[in-house]
Amino acid sequence: MFDNLSGVSYGLLAGILAMLIHLVYQKITELKRRKDELKERESHPTDDLFPKEDFIPYHPSRYSEEEMIKRSNDFYLSMNARRSVRFFSNEDVPDEVIDNIIRTAGTSPSGAHTEPWTFVVIKNKLLKAKVREIIEEEEELNYKQRMGQKWVDDLKPLKTNWIKEYLTEAPYLILVFKQTYGITEDGQKKTHYYNEISASISCGFLLAAIQNAGLVALTSTPLNAGSKLRNLVGRGPNEKIVILLPVGYPSKNCQVPNLKRKPLNEIMIKFD
């Protein structure tokens, strides 16, 4: 039935066939590589979890029941006072405080102890202004075109828009990046297990440390600005931004929405 096909048609079919064969070959090669990697990991099941680490005795502090109840309630009251703040004082914060906050975030658990996070701290005013420029440019498009009217309407009670003064008002910006994979000394990719979950948990530690230090922050997710911010601060293609936090003291006239948190019986299911 191909008797009437021209030489051009035969050439086109041959090209398509060659492309399909190449794609199938690539797929088979990739599947074989993954299978070999899995087989290698299974033959050394503890190598990734405990890479030549020594084990040491561990005896954390133990408190009486009365002290545990008091400490847990005190911590709850402190964290319950935490609010997302959009109005910052430009008053400076000691660098050592920020260093300690980042150290605390770095104590977070991570898959196979890969610690797949990078905390970029920006104090430089010109760089903060550039961050604001990038985010406001994308946020205006988000509000006007990308988010949809329902999302915009849901944000109206919080009185938010694409203007982000806090990005230049707050003394510090902390950008948290997840490392989707690591790079070994010889330039090979290193698997970072559960990198998004691990980095997200570290963000929780970070927020708790900020609250504990007597500072405030705003948890923001720079929608559609991630690659520009990554390039701005010189991070590699293996890193993706998770959250951006302006950090500092609240302004004297700071106000926050009068929001209420869900009671315990709405967030906990308990089996005694």
Curated annotation (Swiss-Prot):
GO terms, biological process: tyrosine metabolic process
Family annotation (Pfam families): Nitroreductase
A single cellular component GO annotation: plasma membrane
Organism: Hydra vulgaris
Catalyses which reaction(s): 2 iodide + L-tyrosine + 2 NADP(+) = 3,5-diiodo-L-tyrosine + 2 NADPH + H(+); iodide + L-tyrosine + NADP(+) = 3-iodo-L-tyrosine + NADPH; 3-iodo-L-tyrosine + iodide + NADP(+) = 3,5-diiodo-L-tyrosine + NADPH + H(+); L-tyrosine + chloride + NADP(+) = 3-chloro-L-tyrosine + NADPH
Localization (cell): Membrane
Binding sites annotated in the UniProt record for 3-iodo-L-tyrosine: A112, E139, Y143, K164
CDD domains in the record: iodotyrosine_dehalogenase (cd02144)
The keyword Mitochondrion appears for this protein: no
Descriptive protein name: Iodotyrosine deiodinase
EC number: 1.21.1.1
Residues annotated for FMN binding in this entry: R82, R83, S84, V85, R86, S110, G111, T219, S220, T221, R261
Function: Catalyzes the dehalogenation of halotyrosines such as 3,5-diiodo-L-tyrosine. Likely to also catalyze the dehalogenation of other halotyrosines such as 3-bromo-L-tyrosine, 3-chloro-L-tyrosine and 3-iodo-L-tyrosine.
GO terms of molecular function: FMN binding; iodotyrosine deiodinase activity
